Regions:
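Extracytoplasmic electron-transfer domains, predominantly the class I c-type cytochrome c fold
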Residues: 28-46, 90, 94, 100-151
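Electrostatic cytochrome c docking/interface patches
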Residues: 36-78, 172-175
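Sequence/structural segment immediately N-terminal to covalent heme-attachment motifs in c-type
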Residues: 68-89, 111-118
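A short beta-strand motif characteristic of beta-propeller blades
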Residues: 206-211, 247-254, 295-300, 304-311, ...
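Short loop/turn segments immediately following beta-strands, especially the blade-tip
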Residues: 241-246, 289-297, 344-348, 389-393, ...
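Loop/turn-rich, solvent-exposed surfaces of beta-rich toroidal or solenoidal domains
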Residues: 418-423, 429-431, 456-540
Length: 580
């Protein structure tokens, strides 16, 4: 007994000392404090999940510390709001480490409390010392991760059809355009926290309509004809908006899961506007739908083996999806398994899928200028995968900077190296330029031909236009307000020149103390204006700033009380034709 008491005393002293030691290293949540893990990465990875509001069953584990039903429910909500993005829905690990009970029970409550409170050099946020969690919440989470992970409900055809609504049947819709808007130059702007998109006339800068959608719309996509606008919220709700109506508005909607990010529509000749596809984070699957009603037709699971270790993964999330222009295929990128699926929709009853092994943690990407090659960031692998959609094979895996996040990227002709595609990064200040012409510039193809140095990490989107001589790079997740509130502009005719900084948030003229993060440059159809969202919290003022691309001067500011948390925006023509 004395020996046992001595060991317990030694363990207690060690645990008591650990917070002090870790706290010294990590209390200041800076890039240096986490050995290269930037605040931008933490902000990006620790995002909330709509699964926080879903009811789930509590399995009692007799080996775990006790929790009441109320405590379990509260902890589950915290987990899905702050932790699931890194550690996975089932706690099997995603971009973060697994938190399964075979690991957490061995660690014990006291160890886990220290780990949660003070973080880790690998990138775990210091939840308590940063003020994000109270000591009581840290104790709650330390006990929660020792319980069996609750499983969210599946979402099959029955559940989808229960949410499917055709608000205006196709036969009752206009047979011609019933408004005077220049549809090609309409912008669909996400109003993140209000669950809406603003349709804005790019010619007059007036709001056409505020359309109710799912929560935190991730992207807007256009049908091949340019008539229908598809938007998908993080809560997996898709809205179909008819731009031909006198006042463009919803004509159909559906939920395709519990959490999602991606939607697109068929573009191949003979299949224009016929099908839509959407992929979900949970359940891990994609669904093919009727293009003008959103009727669900076929659901395909993405659960399977990882591309590297060939281990089974129970929740590989569907990230970006794009439609090829010259044949009936969707390119579906599966995050955790690292697989790129070429889904041939010419006969969905006998579906043919080509599986291409790439790299784990696939996320977003875009076409090269020829629209033959699709480039997609494998963000936590620090790579860009290149798919040859003509030959249906992987063309290359390109090593880039830390956590590439291109949005759709940017295409332009480099003065020395020919056609390139560019991506910014969340984890560092670099902008990678990748050669994309294997025929006329073979030596530069699928290599980083130049790294530009931007303002800093925390970049989400990068953009240019065939008629522009500038490249715009945002940094909304950078911890330095001067950087997050401005954009870097590179001269494409002289890439050795230092970038120019445009003080977009300052130009917006917002008087309150909102964050004023500047996000997602987007050109108008003509390619002579660039739009930026100045994004603050929903109880603060936000705005859209329009810049003259030729002069790099302020052109106009769009302000309206209805512009609540504007983030991404998508010009109809450029989105329809994949111009970026």
């Amino acid at each position: 007994m004395p020996q046992i008491r001595l060991k317990l005393k030694q363990a207690t002293i060690a645990l008591a000392a650990l917070p002090f030691a870790v706290g010294i290293a990590l209390a200041k949540d800076t890039p240096e404090a986490k050995k290269g893990v930037t605040e931008a990465e933490v902000k990006y990875q620790a995002g909330g999940s709509p699964l926080a509001g879903e009811p789930m069953h509590q399995n009692i584990n007799p080996k775990a510390p006790p929790m009441t039903a109320a405590e379990f429910s509260k902890a589950r909500q915290i987990y899905f709001e702050r932790c699931a993005g890194c550690h996975g829905v089932l706690r099997k690990g995603a971009t973060g480490k697994p938190l399964t009970t075979d690991i957490t029970l061995d660690k014990g409550t006291e160890y886990l409390k220290v780990f949660i409170a003070y973080g880790s050099p690998a990138g775990m946020p210091n939840w308590q010392t940063s003020g994000e969690m109270t000591a009581e919440e840290v104790d709650l989470m330390a006990r929660y991760v020792q319980q069996e992970p609750p499983t969210p409900p599946e979402f099959g055809m029955k559940e989808m059809k229960a949410t499917w609504k055709v608000l205006v049947p196709p036969e009752k819709r206009p047979t011609k355009k019933m408004n005077n808007y220049n549809i090609d130059n309409i912008f669909s702007t996400t109003l993140r926290d209000s669950g809406e998109v603003a349709l804005i006339d790019g010619d007059t800068k007036q709001i056409i309509n505020i359309v109710k959608t799912g929560y935190a719309v991730h992207i807007s996509r256009l049908s091949a004809s340019g008539r229908y606008l598809f938007v998908i919220g993080r809560d997996a709700r898709i809205n179909l908006i008819d731009l031909w109506m006198e006042k463009p508005d919803n004509v159909a909607e559906i939920k395709i899961g519990l959490e999602a990010r991606s939607v697109d529509t068929s573009k191949a000749k003979g299949f224009e506007d016929k099908y839509a596809i959407a992929g979900s984070y949970w359940p891990p699957q994609y669904v093919l739908m009727n293009g003008d009603t959103l009727e669900p037709l076929k659901i395909v699971s993405t659960r399977g083996m990882t591309v590297d270790t060939q281990d089974y993964h129970p929740e590989p999330r569907v990230a970006s999806i794009v439609a090829t222009h010259d044949k009936p295929e969707f390119v579906v990128n599966v995050k955790e398994t690292g697989k790129i699926l070429l889904v041939n929709y010419s006969d969905i009853d006998n579906l043919k899928v080509t599986e291409i092994g790439a790299a784990r943690f696939l996320h977003d990407g875009g076409w090269d200028s020829s629209k033959r090659y699709f480039l997609v960031a494998a963000n936590q692998s620090n790579k860009v995968a290149v798919v040859d959609t003509k030959d249906s094979k992987l063309a290359a895996l390109v090593d880039v900077g830390k956590i590439p996040h291109p949005g759709r990227g940017a295409n332009f002709v480099h003065p020395k190296f020919g056609p390139v595609w560019a991506t910014g990064h969340l984890g560092d200040e670099s902008v990678a330029l990748i050669g994309t012409d294997p025929e006329k510039h073979k030596d530069q193809a699928w290599k980083v031909v130049q790294n530009l140095k931007g303002q800093g990490g925390g970049s989400l989107f990068i953009k240019t236009h065939p008629k522009s001589k500038y490249l715009y790079v945002d940094t909304p997740l950078n911890p330095d307000a001067k950087i997050s509130q401005s954009v870097a502009v590179f001269d494409l005719e002289n890439l050795d020149k230092p970038y120019q900084v445009l003080p977009i948030a300052e130009w917006a003229g917002l008087s309150d103390d909102g964050a004023k993060r500047v996000v997602q440059p987007e050109f108008n159809k003509a390619g002579d204006e660039v739009w930026f969202s100045v994004w603050s919290a929903k109880d603060k003022e936000s705005a859209i700033v329009v810049v003259d691309d030729k002069t790099l001067k302020l052109k106009t500011v769009i302000k309206d009380p209805k512009l609540i948390t504007p983030t991404g925006h998508f010009n109809v023509y450029n989105t329809q034709h994949d111009i970026y």
